[in-house]
Design a protein with these regions (language model features):
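Extracellular beta-strand/beta-solenoid scaffold signature
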Residues: 53-60, 74-82, 100-116, 131-146, ...
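The right-handed parallel beta-helix/beta-solenoid scaffold, focusing on the short coil/turn
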Residues: 64-66, 70, 77-79, 85-89, ...
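C-terminal, structured domain-capping segment
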Residues: 1-56
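Extracellular/surface-exposed low-complexity segments
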Residues: 53-58, 155-156, 160, 168-219
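Short acidic, Gly/Pro-enriched loop/turn segments at secondary-structure junctions
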Residues: 40-44, 102-104, 190-191
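Generic short beta-strand segments
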Residues: 2-8, 70-73, 94-98, 127
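Short loop/turn segments at secondary-structure transitions that flank enzyme active sites
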Residues: 34-38, 129, 185
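Acidic Ser/Thr/Pro-rich low-complexity disordered segments
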Residues: 44-46, 61, 184
Length: 219
């Protein structure tokens, strides 16, 4: 809205004695009637949030086959994705694990994926990260397996607050994480730092180092 001073107005419109109280003033109101469009459109474009998390609660199953294709941001206390007993998961989505403490407030976790029992998780793609891990509690596994669980990684990007805990299996368990692809931040899955024979790069694959990232590719 633009207001114009009439061109015929002269110096008599100036305030008396330069006192702002006497300055000319205009008061008006505006009423807008609008119809909401069927699609979003704003200064950021209508696709700026297309990769936003669609799932905001942890997912847990103890049986059956399940596929995750929508991006997640959920509590990582016990795993944003929790595979238990005989459950089987296939993941091709971003999974952001939010640091969460237990009820006592003494211990916390930020696991993107946790597999237990005889479960199996196949990760084909996505971005896996931790959110809000405090500096005084960086010991949080990103991808974790225990029991007899099996995790297979075919692709995706993985970045943990403490890179040494990107992939981990519980000591003394029969769990295993097999890597056939993916990019890992400051973590070499062919030379893991936590436990022997827990994390393995599958035969026919090798690691290529590129800056801060370790990429698993076929021979």
């Amino acid at each position: 809205m633009v207001l114009y001073m009439p061109t015929e107005v002269g110096n008599e419109a100036n305030p008396k004695n330069n006192d702002p109280y006497w300055a000319a003033k205009v008061s008006f109101g505006i009423s807008v009637s609008a119809t909401q469009a069927m699609s979003e459109s704003d200064s950021f474009g209508n696709t700026y949030d297309e990769d936003a998390a669609a799932i905001l609660s942890a997912i847990s199953f103890s049986s059956g086959k399940h596929e995750i294709t929508q991006n997640m941001q959920a509590s990582g206390r016990f795993g944003a994705v929790q595979a238990e007993r005989t459950a089987q998961f296939t993941i091709n989505a971003d999974v952001y694990a939010v640091y969460t403490k237990d009820a006592s407030g003494t211990t916390g976790g930020a696991m993107a994926v946790s597999a237990d029992g005889n479960s199996k998780v196949i990760i084909n793609g996505g971005d896996f990260r931790q959110v809000g891990v405090p500096a005084d509690d960086p010991v949080c596994d990103l991808i974790y397996a225990l029991g007899n669980a099996q995790i297979e990684i075919n692709g995706g990007t993985f970045k943990a607050t403490d890179p040494t805990r990107t992939l981990n299996c519980k000591d003394g368990s029969n769990a295993k994480i097999t890597v056939k692809g993916g990019s890992f931040y400051k973590y070499d899955p062919s030379n893991p730092t936590l436990g022997d024979n827990e994390v393995v790069v599958a035969a026919g694959y090798h690691v290529e180092h590129n800056g801060d990232w370790f990429n698993v590719v076929a021979d």
